[in-house]
Amino acid sequence: MTGYDKVRKGYKWEVLALLWVAYLLNQADRQVFNVVLPLIREDLGLSDVAVGTIATVFNLFYAMLVPIGGFIGDRFSRKWIVTASVLFWSIATMFTGLCNGFLMLVVMRSIATGGGEAFFGPANYSLIADYHDRTRAFAMSIHQTAYYVG
């Protein structure tokens, strides 16, 4: 029996609801960037290669950091990792609006935002698994709907 088994009855669903909202914001952040990218491209005078580079660096940086996020998620408080990553990528997203050139956009969007989001996933899914033993598949399926709504 873990400490997660001793929480009050509905708490695991409250945790799921909060993680659902966080995941919704995570996916909305990714999708809205694609929507505004033509405006950013025009405003900053970016080429097709530059726009593709931003997406490539985001994906590469994210892919490199996800295992590190999992490693850290196994050793430190997952709830604080989720909290810190949401705050970090939210602030990075806010500062993305202040970018005035390609390099700054790569740093803010790809490295800062992608880096923050990379630490979210492993801790997020681990928390769901911790709180939902017999309802794990159902909880994961509910959580996954945030991907499609976001």
Q: Which residue ranges define each predicted feature?
A:
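Juxtamembrane helix-start elements in MFS-like secondary transporters
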Residues: 47-51, 55
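Conserved MFS/SLC helix-loop-helix module at the cytosolic interface between two early adjacent transmembrane helices
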Residues: 64-103
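Helical-face signature of the major facilitator-like transporter fold
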Residues: 19-27, 59, 93, 101-114
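Extracytoplasmic
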Residues: 14-48, 69
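Structural signature of transmembrane alpha-helices in multi-pass secondary transporters
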Residues: 55-58, 62, 114, 143-150
